[in-house]
C-alpha cells in the first residue's frame, strides 16, 4: 500500500443517496482495515411505481470549476413499473492541474515541480506558473446500473453493478523537498 489510496473517489458523488460515518474500531463488522472507522456510501436505488403509470426520473448535471479546470457531466435515469424498476447512471469528469487563487499565501506557491526523465529518475523542473500544482490532473468515468424486482410484497430482488475507471492519478504526496545545492531529497 504505497501512496495515496483513491478508493473513495471511485463513487460518483451524484449517485450517493446517503452517507454513514462510523468512528472508532469497526473491524469486527468490516474487517481489519476498519480499525480506525468506516465510511459507508449508499447509492441511489431504483424506484418502483406505486400506480399503473411508470415512475420516470431524469437528472442531468454539468459543472465547471476554475480551480482545477474540472469539467463534469452526469446523467441518471430511473424507469420504474409496479414490479420492476431500472436505474442507470453515467458520470464523466476531467480534472486539470490544481491552481491556487491569487489571494493564497506565498508559502504554497510551487516554483518547481517533480517529474521523471526518460530513465525514470525524478528531476526538478522550473514551474512556469507558480500557482499551479503540476501533475495533479486526471480523468474518470463512472457507470452504475441497478435493477429491483418485487414479484410480491414478501420478496425483493436487487441487482447492482458499478464500474469506475480513473486515468493515471499522479503521486503528489511523494512531493520531495528540493534543495538548490543537492537536488531532490525525500522528507525524513
Where are these regions (language model features)?
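Short acidic/polar hinge/loop motifs at secondary-structure boundaries
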Residues: 1-25, 29, 143
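Short beta-strands and strand-coil junctions in structured, solvent-facing domains, enriched
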Residues: 25-29, 46-49, 95
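N-terminal periplasmic accessory domains that precede
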Residues: 5-11, 21, 34-61, 71-75
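Outer-membrane beta-barrel strand-turn architecture
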Residues: 80-83, 149-153
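Flexible loop and strand-edge segments within Gram-negative outer membrane beta-barrel domains
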Residues: 134-140, 150-188
Amino acid at each position: 500500500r504505497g501512496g495515496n489510496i483513491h478508493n473513495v473517489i471511485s463513487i460518483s458523488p451524484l449517485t450517493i443517496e446517503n452517507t454513514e460515518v462510523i468512528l472508532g474500531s469497526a473491524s469486527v463488522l468490516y474487517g481489519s482495515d476498519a480499525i480506525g472507522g468506516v465510511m459507508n456510501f449508499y447509492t441511489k436505488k431504483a424506484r418502483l411505481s406505486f400506480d399503473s403509470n411508470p415512475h420516470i426520473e431524469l437528472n442531468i448535471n454539468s459543472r465547471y470549476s476554475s480551480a482545477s479546470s474540472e469539467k463534469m457531466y452526469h446523467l441518471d435515469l430511473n424507469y420504474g413499473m409496479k414490479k420492476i424498476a431500472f436505474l442507470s447512471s453515467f458520470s464523466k469528469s476531467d480534472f486539470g492541474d490544481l491552481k491556487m487563487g491569487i489571494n493564497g499565501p506565498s508559502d504554497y506557491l510551487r516554483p518547481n515541480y517533480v517529474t521523471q526523465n526518460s530513465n525514470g529518475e525524478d528531476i526538478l523542473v522550473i514551474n512556469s506558473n507558480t500557482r499551479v500544482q503540476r501533475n495533479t490532473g486526471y480523468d474518470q468515468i463512472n457507470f452504475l446500473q441497478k435493477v429491483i424486482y418485487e414479484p410480491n410484497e414478501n420478496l425483493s430482488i436487487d441487482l447492482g453493478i458499478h464500474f469506475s475507471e480513473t486515468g493515471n492519478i499522479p503521486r503528489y504526496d511523494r512531493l520531495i523537498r528540493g534543495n538548490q545545492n543537492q537536488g531532490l531529497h525525500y522528507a525524513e
